[in-house]
């Protein structure tokens, strides 16, 4: 049986507010925090080969997404919708088709994603994984 593609789905603001250095950037300007997180996730994707999807709460009329298929996929929720809802929908739609890992501090979101077959980790666990991978990549 072929190996299923691996995806990491990240609740962007959940991670930003859990990591002190990103929270500090968020206080200055939210775009700085988002860009710093995306850069780290891009590195993680490059090092591991695991595809990364990051979801942020947005303000627009529709769900926005990045267009480069080889880059980190970035989604913004539409007005009146939360990033949580998008993460849950992605887990529901793809949880049994792909190997999913969901990074969020939201307990309900973790429960929903887990019920859909995803492995759930906290932002702190994500930080640890990223540090381990970075250390191995530098050797």
Q: What kind of feature is each model-predicted range?
A:
Residues 2-10, 14-139:
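Nuclease catalytic cores that cleave nucleic-acid phosphodiester bonds
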């Amino acid at each position: 049986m072929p190996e299923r593609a691996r995806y990491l789905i990240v609740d962007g603001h959940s991670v930003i507010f859990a990591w002190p250095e990103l929270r500090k950037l968020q206080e200055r300007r939210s775009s700085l925090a988002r860009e710093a997180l995306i850069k780290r996730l891009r590195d993680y994707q490059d090092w591991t080969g695991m595809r990364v999807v990051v979801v942020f709460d947005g303000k627009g009329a529709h769900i926005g997404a990045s267009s480069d298929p080889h880059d980190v996929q970035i989604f913004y929720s539409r007005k009146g919708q939360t990033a949580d809802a998008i993460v849950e929908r992605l887990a529901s739609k793809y949880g049994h088709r792909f190997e999913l890992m969901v990074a969020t501090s939201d307990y309900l979101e973790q429960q929903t994603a887990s019920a859909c077959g995803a492995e759930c980790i906290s932002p702190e666990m994500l930080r640890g994984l990223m540090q381990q991978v970075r250390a191995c990549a530098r050797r």
